[in-house]
Curated annotation (Swiss-Prot):
Entry GO terms, CC: cytosol; glycine cleavage complex
Gene that this sequence comes from: gcvP
Protein's UniProt name: Glycine dehydrogenase (decarboxylating)
Domain of life: Bacteria
Listed GO biological process terms: glycine decarboxylation via glycine cleavage system
Database matches in PANTHER family: GLYCINE DEHYDROGENASE (DECARBOXYLATING), MITOCHONDRIAL, GLYCINE DEHYDROGENASE, DECARBOXYLATING
Reactions performed catalytically: N(6)-[(R)-lipoyl]-L-lysyl-[glycine-cleavage complex H protein] + glycine + H(+) = N(6)-[(R)-S(8)-aminomethyldihydrolipoyl]-L-lysyl-[glycine-cleavage complex H protein] + CO2
Organism in which the protein naturally occurs: Rhizobium etli (strain ATCC 51251 / DSM 11541 / JCM 21823 / NBRC 15573 / CFN 42)
Family: Belongs to the GcvP family.
The keyword Oxidoreductase belongs to this UniProt entry's keyword annotation: yes
Alphabetical UniProt keywords: Oxidoreductase, Pyridoxal phosphate
Modified residues (N6-(pyridoxal phosphate)lysine): 704
Subunit structure: The glycine cleavage system is composed of four proteins: P, T, L and H.
Gene Ontology terms for molecular function: glycine binding; glycine dehydrogenase (decarboxylating) activity; pyridoxal phosphate binding
EC top class, as a word: oxidoreductase
Length: 954
């Protein structure tokens, strides 16, 4: 031990978020990794990876990076500029109570929020069960046969319902009827969706204005946006007689007291599960739902959880009917829906489990009683309350007093809804207190208390619900919080999320979702703001949105952004609509051809189809680059009608193509616009800007590049950036600027998760974001280098480099050993890893994206696992292992395998503890390999009957 002669200060920064917390490898580890790859410096690797022509000229510079504490202080200062009033605005957004056991153990739990979409069912059984509970809940309450596992928001679900109605209707009409009592944002989104497809939208009173022979479908709001509760049974019957489809947009809480849409004969029901314990959050995120009749289930959009069996015959859950989806069907898909709202659907399903049918019914009754009491007080003041029958929403005509009363209510701490120029609306909810009613009465000039009135009900007797719901045992479990906590824990333990291991999914960017970034989303100043409050009550939100927009413009080289799209797919849709509207404004509405490479994300052609574009497919060369000869020929062939091209950069093959500028120039030469898919932006931030390359519009996946967690399949955010000439054509919204083109129910999409991306930017700074990009490229090249002797890295640049991801070819194993890409993926589960992206963009391959957040130790563990798998395949090739009875074909191995009778020609240790697997903290798959074919042939998409649990236990 040495004794220092004088005190020395250290330059170590313990709270340097970018270099100590977000970026995985240490400087010493980076040096080791660079040596393996063959470079002396990180800059040397970056120079070899990115073509000089696409490098941005100036560094990404803004204020110095903040520590976690400084960023949280900044977020708190900003949040405090929002005013949290009691909002009775309604219009699809309501106060609700998130049970603390759900907030702490799901919303704030990385085991739930860092998981990926459950494409690998064996390691997703927990959230698949929670989603099956959600589907069962929705089916029960809507009275329909089958429900999906969530959509983006109620208005989007309504637009999807219209599109589905057109697909399945026997009627050949090209018009869709919309109940004028639908929420305004729903009407706006339906108009947006219908116009490019050539469908006319008729808005009116369904009882006087609907002629079923003129439409392919109709949507009714139940209860209506202004409170009316109507029986649509007769109208639905008339629609069916005309070969048209009925859609009912229903309030999920009201359905506990009211006759279900299914009992009215509805074909499709849509709505939001927000009021089942999910905060309003200035518009989102919230899980929408869709339920349909069994006969039309294959035309339903979105993901669908079903029941199957595993290799032992035990019950297992999986995503069913995936051939409907965009990643397989592309432009023929039912929708471009990709990321949905899984985390929020899980919360809503747990709200139903937490309360059970009795609890939810009691909440609904209490909400209704509050609304009746509110009406009685207003009637005592001499106002006529409309409608006569209602659930939670009433409207009063106050004439010229509207503004005065609205301001008086705000002074009392309450937001009411402005309806037209003379009316005021209000929607009561679970959080409404007696003091709130009395405050509203004072705003109207009253001075009495809630004790002055007797509770009663004003629901129409003919529509009172008599059918059961939530009858499955899962909704009748013991209400003790200890049981609820353990149930949530049991489900999360079945899943593999980022809190356990790296998830190296190519094109998915499963990077760190730092705890400091997540904390603010549950602050009331962000979570309890209604999306339609007056602007002066959301100044903090606006400040954050403005600064985040400025930062994203700096990152991308674009001039303007819209934060409205609430998923990447919605961003594509919004961007293509923007291009379409630009052409129309220039008198070139005939431009409807979209050039898309065969390697594109499946959402690209699906989104193009949704805006009425004709998809022309461009070939890709053997090296993964776009075939410029074919691209040039098709651009010239369709020059007169060319609307745009859609490209991904770096390419979906994980390489920076050198012809990207030439592509942009060629499209512009022929009058088109360039849409650059921002899914791979994690390889560009700080190094290259789409707007400088020649792109006109991009969406950014904030749930990839900018740290919003994937949530097991949502939420996400897909804001779009555009060059100045496209800015006037960005989406509008009826509640803000009144312009057309809304693509999400709320003006700023899922606004309450934007603090995550903003705090990430604040803590990283421009220099940190740039370093993150460089390390993402380093990590991918390190893996590619370590694996290249065992596997062929399919695509590389001229310099032999990959971008932020690499594709390894497992196809040769099929011929040499019979080992498929599925076998490799399932064997990785035994090693404690989520498989990389399988069979995309090339069948039989694995696309690996490690991100910048993974340490060298974790990268090495993954490489050891992949190398060991190759050795197992080699043992099959050499005859040292059986070709069908081996660890790869039998993977994943479960505890049941370990303790059961062992008759396999390899050891238990080899099966369960391959290289890469932890011994002490090993992840065990809860099921063996899931039978996909069985699940689709025997489709069950609600909770199995209780008898099946007994059978499974035998």
């Amino acid at each position: 031990m040495t004794t220092p002669t004088e005190f020395q200060f250290t330059d170590y920064q313990p709270y340097d978020f970018a270099n100590r917390r977000h970026i995985g490898p240490s400087p010493a580890e980076m040096a080791e990794m660079l040596k393996v790859i063959g470079y002396n410096s990180l800059e040397g690797l970056i120079d070899a990876t990115l073509p000089p022509a696409i490098r941005q000229k100036a560094p990404l510079v803004w204020g110095a990076p903040m520590t976690e504490r400084e960023a949280l202080d900044k977020l708190r200062e900003t949040a405090n500029k929002n005013k949290v009033l009691v909002s009775l605005i309604g219009q699809g957004y309501y106060g609700t109570i998130t049970p603390p056991v759900i907030q702490r153990n799901i919303l704030e739990n990385p085991a739930w929020y860092t998981a990926y979409t459950p494409y690998q069912p064996e390691i997703s059984q927990g959230r698949l069960e929670a989603l099956l509970n959600y589907q069962t809940m929705v089916c029960d309450l809507t009275g329909l046969d089958i429900a999906n596992a969530s959509l983006l928001d109620e208005a989007t679900a309504a637009a999807e319902g219209m599109a589905m109605a057109e697909r399945v209707a026997k009627s050949k009409a090209k018009a869709f009827f919309v109940d004028a009592d639908c929420h305004p944002q729903t009407i706006a989104l339906i108009r947006t969706r219908a116009e490019p497809l050539g469908w006319s939208v008729i808005v009116g009173n369904p009882f006087t204005d609907l002629d079923p022979v003129d439409v392919f479908g109709a949507i009714f709001q139940y209860p209506g946006t202004h409170g009316h509760v109507h029986d649509f049974t007769g109208l639905i019957a008339r629609l069916h007689q005309a070969g048209a489809i009925s859609v009912v947009a229903a309030d999920i809480l009201a359905l506990t007291l009211l006759k279900s849409p299914g009992e009215m004969g509805a074909d499709i029901a849509v709505g939001s599960s927000q009021r089942f314990g999910v905060p309003v959050g200035y518009g989102g995120p919230h899980a929408a739902f869709m339920a349909v009749r069994d006969a039309i289930k294959r035309a339903m959009p979105g993901r669908l959880v079903g029941v199957s069996v595993d290799a032992r015959g035990n019950r297992a859950y999986r995503l069913s009917l995936q051939t409907r989806e965009q990643h397989i069907r592309r432009e023929k898909a039912t929708s471009n829906i990709c990321t949905a709202q899984v985390l929020l659907a899980v919360m809503a399903s747990m709200y139903a489990v937490f309360h059970g049918p009795d609890g939810i019914k009691a909440i609904a009754q209490q909400v209704h009683q509050k609304a009746v009491l509110m009406a009685k007080g207003l009637e005592k003041l001499g106002y006529k309350v409309e409608p006569e029958s209602f659930f939670d929403t009433i409207t009063v005509d106050v004439g010229h007093m509207q503004g005065l009363i609205l301001r008086a209510a705000v002074a009392e701490g309450v937001n009411l809804r402005k309806v037209g120029e003379t009316k005021i609306g209000m929607s009561l909810d679970e959080r409404t207190r007696p003091a709130t009613l009395e405050a509203v009465w004072r705003a109207f000039g009253g001075n009495f208390t809630i004790a002055d009135f007797e509770p009663s009900y004003r629901l129409p007797k003919a529509l009172l619900r008599t059918s059961e719901y939530l009858s499955h045992p899962i909704f009748h479990m013991n209400r003790a919080e200890s049981e609820m906590t353990r149930y949530i824990r049991r489900l999360s333990d079945r899943d593999l999320a980022l809190d356990r291991a790296m998830i190296p999914l190519g094109s998915c960017t499963m990077k760190l979702n730092a705890t400091a970034e997540m904390l603010p989303i549950t602050w009331p100043e962000f979570s309890d703001i209604h999306p339609f409050v007056p602007a002066d009550q959301a100044l903090g939100y606006r400040e954050m949105l403005d600064d985040l927009t400025e930062k994203l413009c700096a990152v991308t080289g674009y001039d303007a952004f819209s934060m409205q799209p609430n998923s990447g797919a919605q961003g594509e849709y919004a961007g293509l609509l923007t291009i379409r509207n630009y052409h129309i404004a220039n008198g070139e509405g005939h431009r409807d051809v979209c050039l898309i490479p065969t390697s594109a994300h499946g959402t690209n052609p699906a989104s193009a189809q949704m805006v009425g574009m004709k998809v022309v497919v461009v070939k890709v060369r053997e090296n993964g680059d776009i075939d410029m000869e074919d691209f040039r020929a098709k651009a010239e062939e369709h020059a007169a009608n060319l609307s745009c091209c859609m490209i991904t950069y770096p390419s979906t093959h994980g390489v920076f193509e050198e012809t990207v500028k030439e592509i942009c120039e060629l499209v512009h030469k022929h009058g088109g616009q360039v849409y650059l898919d921002g899914a791979n932006m994690n390889a560009m931030v700080g190094l290259s800007r789409p707007g400088d390359i020649g792109s006109d519009v991009s969406h950014l996946n904030l749930h990839k590049t900018f740290c919003i967690p994937h949530g097991g399949g949502g939420p996400g955010m897909g804001p779009i950036g555009v060059k100045a000439h496209l800015a006037p054509h960005l989406p509008g919204h009826p509640e803000t600027d009144g312009r057309p083109g809304a693509v999400s129910a709320a003006p700023f999409g899922s606004a309450s998760i934007l603090p995550i991306s903003w705090s990430y930017c604040l803590m990283m700074g421009g220099e940190g974001l740039t370093q993150a990009t460089k390390v993402a490229i380093l990590n991918a090249n390190y893996i590619a280098t370590r694996l290249k002797g065992a596997y062929n890295v399919l695509y590389k640049s001229k310099t032999g480099r990959v971008a932020h991801e690499c594709i390894i070819d497992t196809r040769p194993l099929v011929d040499s050993s019979g080992v498929t890409v599925d076998d490799v993926a399932k064997r990785l589960i035994d090693c404690g890893f989520h498989a990389p992206t399988m069979s995309w963009p090339v069948a039989g391959t694995l696309m690996i994206e490690p991100t910048e957040s993974e340490t060298k130790a974790e990268l090495d563990r993954f490489c050891e696992a992949m190398l060991a798998i190759r050795e197992e395949a080699r043992a099959i090739e050499d005859g040292r292992m059986d070709k069908t009875n081996n660890p790869l074909k039998n993977a994943p191995h479960t505890v049941e395998d370990l303790v059961g009778e062992w008759d396999r020609p390899y050891s238990r240790e080899q099966a369960c503890f391959p290289p890469g697997a932890f011994r002490v903290d090993k992840y065990w798959s809860p099921v063996n390999r899931v039978d996909n074919v069985y699940g689709d042939r025997n489709l069950i998409c609600t909770c199995p009957p209780v008898e099946s649990y007994a059978e499974a236990a035998e």
